[in-house]
Amino acid sequence: MKKETIFSEVETANSKQLAVLKANFPQCFDKNGAFIQEKLLEIIRASEVELSKESYSLNWLGKSYARLLANLPPKTLLAEDKTHNQQEENKNSQHLLIKGDNLEVLKHMVNAYAEKVKMIYIDPPYNTGKDGFVYNDDRKFTPEQLSELAGIDLDEAKRILEFTTKGSSSHSAWLTFIYPRLYIARELMREDGTIFISIDHNEFSQLKLVCDEIFGEQNHVGDLVWKNATDNNPSNIAVEHEYIIVYTKNKEQLISEWKSNISDVKNLLVNIGEEFASKYTGNELQEKYTQWFREHRSELWPLDRYKYIDKDGIYTGSQSVHNPGKEGYRYDIIHPKTKKPCKQPLMGYRFPLDTMDRLLSEEKIIFGDDENKIIELKVYAKDYKQKLSSVIHLDGRVATNELKELFPEMTQPFTNAKTIKLVEDLISFACDGEGIVLDFFAGSGTTAHTVFNLNNKNKTSYQFITVQLDEPTKDKSDAMKHGYNTIFDLTKERLIRASKKNRDQGFKVYQLMPDFRAKDESELTLSNHTFFDDVVLTPEQYDTLLTTWCLYDGSLLTTPIEDVDLGGYKAHLCDGRLYLIAPNFTSEALKALLQKVDSDKDFAPNKVVFYGSNFESAKQMELNEALKSYANKKSIELDLVVRN
């Protein structure tokens, strides 16, 4: 029988990292726990890893504290919004909206969602001096405590606490804010997962260096420049762009080339091709399309070379018949008009003769006016895949119109919202139609809305997880005037409206709750008898404890929790774990549990977790002895955990 109290671990700025070293390189520690550096160097040299003598790092006031924050356990619990989640359109949804501090939410997610997130897109505060970013921290450390836990001297601890408690918008404060969030986010990413971070010039340089430290410089995919505005303000340089920094968990696991099937121009050409092919044939088909192409060519970039059409659609000529880099196949192709062999590519053809004969029979080869032009291969618009350009031209004001469609009653529901088109493009390049897309700075809810749209239009199966702080809307704002008191309320309403426009995909809602197990000694009085009464849980506390435990034990928030009747006692089964939280677990309930293990072929728990505060010591021992000594017919070994 194992006893544990979750979220009670005493962590330091380096304790988790040290534990990883001890687990993977035990030979590098002596019997007293001292690290033997030379042993690790031997392992590295034996693996023929080159040792660099040059290095640099980014340091700031609060870095040790930021690392400590990344390691500390959450100080909250997670609760389900049952009323919302049980609605017909939401009850089977895999999408999640979570209310609360995103650092706390990420900490809760680690056990269940580690290495499961395909893509992260975040739009954190830019720290412009005008966006309202101020670092606030409600953790209550004394200088002495922080000095010990973060491994810093007392003077530095005092200076850190000064800016964390009084509020600051310095570079150091912003880095202290963003570091632990990115650190935990990396743990959630799949090996082939990517993270896209929107930022502007104010923190771009700092963010790049801190990402190098967290994700590894070798896993930097690139930086995108988003040209999203026109700046007519009097200045030396008109600032008309933002940045999107891109990193991956493991670049060796990333596909070598990103291409996207999503293109508005492609869709236009495919539709025009189908329309014209249904109306015209032969020379008239090409003549009509040529006329249309000349009129619209300026709108067709990057497909403004697709000037031909046949019954199969609109196409262009490609020199992909050339063999790249080495000697290819040699044979003659006769020009249909001059009856002479066509000029061959310098290195020959890339296809063998039988493949070329098939392409010729299918009329997929383009000939020039005579034999002096090298043949080309027909490449159809319907097969076009777009590459991700490092420069994105997309008017940021489009987001205002997107929101106006959802909130016609409001002039400006959100400020500085990102456009659906931007996030849609990023997802289409980095993902392949499935996986979890995470946004822990939900804001206007653009990422979640984009996932709804993609799943509806392209029949993809993405799931979003999006997190938003319960932040008040501004006084006299459009949102406040329409009854939305918090950003979360408005984000949730956007997702409700967006879901209705996209096959009612729905979403589930969860929220952080104060940890009711945490007690403050200053609250202890003789009249406050419930201070001692840990066994009395309200229905909300009961459900919150169950939700938090299931997530802590590795179950996704969308995993069903099944009620189990044990002779009138209600237990809960989730992913093979049986939870006993309610009081009054009787001998009859224990007997019913053992009988169910034997007789119910679908009931095969591997662990029993019970709430220690609701089980007297004698009952704990009875349960432990019964499970250890009972030889059930399925030969199941049941682990027993007493949890508080």
From Swiss-Prot:
Forms a homodimer capable of methylating the target sequence in the absence of Res. A heterotetramer with stoichiometry Res(2)Mod(2). A heterotrimer with stoichiometry Res(1)Mod(2). The keyword rRNA-binding does not apply. It is an enzyme of class 2 (transferase). SUPFAM superfamilies: S-adenosyl-L-methionine-dependent methyltransferases (SSF53335). GO terms for molecular function: DNA binding; N-methyltransferase activity; site-specific DNA-methyltransferase (adenine-specific) activity. It catalyses: a 2'-deoxyadenosine in DNA + S-adenosyl-L-methionine = an N(6)-methyl-2'-deoxyadenosine in DNA + S-adenosyl-L-homocysteine + H(+). Disulfide bonds: none annotated. DNA restriction requires both the Res and Mod subunits. The keyword Amino-acid biosynthesis does not apply. It comes from the Bacteria. GO terms for biological process: DNA restriction-modification system; methylation. InterPro entries: DNA_methylase_N4/N6 (IPR002941), DNA_methylase_N6_adenine_CS (IPR002052), N4/N6-MTase_EcoPI_Mod-like (IPR002295), SAM-dependent_MTases_sf (IPR029063), T3RM_EcoP15I_C (IPR041405). Residues 123-126 are annotated as: Binding of S-adenosyl methionine. It comes from Escherichia coli. Belongs to the N(4)/N(6)-methyltransferase family. Keywords: DNA-binding, Methyltransferase, Plasmid, Restriction system, S-adenosyl-L-methionine, Transferase. Its EC number is 2.1.1.72. This R-M system is also called EcoP15. This is Type III restriction-modification enzyme EcoP15I Mod subunit.
